[in-house]
Amino acid sequence: VLSAADKTHVKAFWGKVGGHAAEFGAEALERMFASFPPTKTYFSHMDLSHGSAQVKAHGKKVADALTLAVGHLDDLPGALSTLSDLHAHKLRVDPVNFKFLSHCLLVTLACHLPDDFTPAVHASMDKFMAGVSTVLVSKYR
């Protein structure tokens, strides 16, 4: 559960991500594919090369979902219900992959916004990403 301070940190930090969200989402995906090669199996239909238009497009989808989640911190299950259904029932993504992508996104954000990615913001963003991951795997049960 995100505290009031966590919510403040997440909203303020995501605001600083701003127009770079899609770019950072794509970079996090590329980082995940490089660091955790088995994740590529879910994207076998895509060109996974660096800078690929398909990876950029999916990075934008990731960023848009996170922007939606940031706007609904008090109701992540409601905001992400459709995505949860998609990943659980249609795509059948192994739940561990959400942790991998979360980690890679946090690394990407820390690399690009080091002055803003304070220990407190890191902790809050980690809790936020864990919450998003929990919601996305909730329909697997």
Swiss-Prot record:
Q: Which GO terms describe its molecular function?
A: haptoglobin binding; heme binding; iron ion binding; organic acid binding; oxygen binding; oxygen carrier activity; peroxidase activity
Q: Choose one Gene Ontology CC annotation of this protein and give it.
A: hemoglobin complex
Point out residues bearing the modification N6-succinyllysine.
7, 11, 16, 40
User: Which InterPro entries does the protein's record reference?
Assistant: Globin, Globin-like_sf, Globin/Proto, Hemoglobin_a-typ, Hemoglobin_oxygen_transport, Hemoglobin_pi
Which residues span the membrane?
Answer: none
Q: Give residues annotated as binding O2.
A: 58
Q: Which SUPFAM superfamilies match?
A: Globin-like
Phosphothreonine: residues bearing it: 8, 108, 134
Signal peptide limits: none
The family this protein is said to belong to: Belongs to the globin family.
The job of this chain, per UniProt, is described as: Involved in oxygen transport from the lung to the various peripheral tissues.
Q: What is this protein called?
A: Hemoglobin subunit alpha
Q: Which organism is it from?
A: Dasypus novemcinctus (Nine-banded armadillo)
Gene name, per UniProt, is: HBA
